[in-house]
């Protein structure tokens, strides 16, 4: 087993459940256990290390040029409930492998090399990419009710503000990640050069009907909110398949009121999520869903936009640089979008050029205990990351 694969298994298995899955939620005991473990590895590599006010891990290898901006590599160290070893942690340990190879070769970069292990990238009441949004200053902790949410994690608006960095000193941000989809695995391609991160648009959809007795209300007289919601979901699912072959639509949560087996549901609330690179596609899809809702009898629908993270393009220069590295090393690769959100979003939102490198997820499985990427792909992707850093150090973005 390679050094990187061994480190990934050690760090990534912190928080292992009896069923083999991993639960290492942001701000949890297991999260900070992983943080301390990786902090020790950073110190072994001679990095200047700190834990910032919101639980992000930060390490620096100083460069030879005090005027040069930092090359930044990172990802997140938290998982979803019952997640896997590789999501996020691959990027942090892969970044540490870059630092380790520099040490092996006695090489000092001209640019400082900064490595971030971010807290709470996964969705929570604080919103996704929490740690990186604090670092970039993208997060506004003063919005109403947010202080109470932060307090649940022993955090505060003051700590969130104190985590902000001067990202004008960042040359670029690179993130090494598993694909979390099946394109690379299905096609047998070794590396994905990410072109951008898709829009993720969420709506809270409420169907309003009328609660009544389940036994005495005839079928012709019912105003069943759950039936209306089901019809809308099926119509939206079919439309998503027709509209665009890279549009994805998910209803991951639904709640019914009053939620009793002998009462017709008077209300159903669901989360509708749509993802695509092109805003015009998600706008059209949303308009189509609203039109479908108007045609469904015995129900009224209300739509509230709860989150809108619009697509983020990767920097064309970094796309070309990573593409060139793969070509020079004769690594099979493809330029492709990311269907998942990443900490790179927050960096790009505040003007930092971003690049991302994907390696295959076996069977496209992620956010589950059987998430898996082959060891040879892990080492291959890390080498692409290392060579990219060397080229960036020589020529800049």
Where are these predicted regions, by residue range?
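His/Asp/Glu-rich mid-to-C-terminal helical/loop segments that flank catalytic regions of hydrolases
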Residues: 195, 217-219, 223-242, 359-397
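Zn-dependent metallopeptidase/amidohydrolase metal-coordination segment
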Residues: 7-13, 17, 74-75, 333-387, ...
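A short beta-alpha structural unit
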Residues: 24-26, 250-259, 271-277, 301-319, ...
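A non-catalytic alpha/beta surface segment that caps or lines the substrate-entry region
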Residues: 16-62
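Acidic, glycine-rich active-site loops and adjacent beta-strand->loop/helix elements
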Residues: 55, 77-79, 116-125, 180, ...
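Active-site metal-coordination/substrate-binding segment of hydrolases
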Residues: 39-43, 48, 57-132, 136-151, ...
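Midchain, well-structured core segments that form catalytic/ion-binding scaffolds
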Residues: 120-128, 132-279
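N-terminal capping segment at the start of a domain
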Residues: 1-28, 305, 365-366
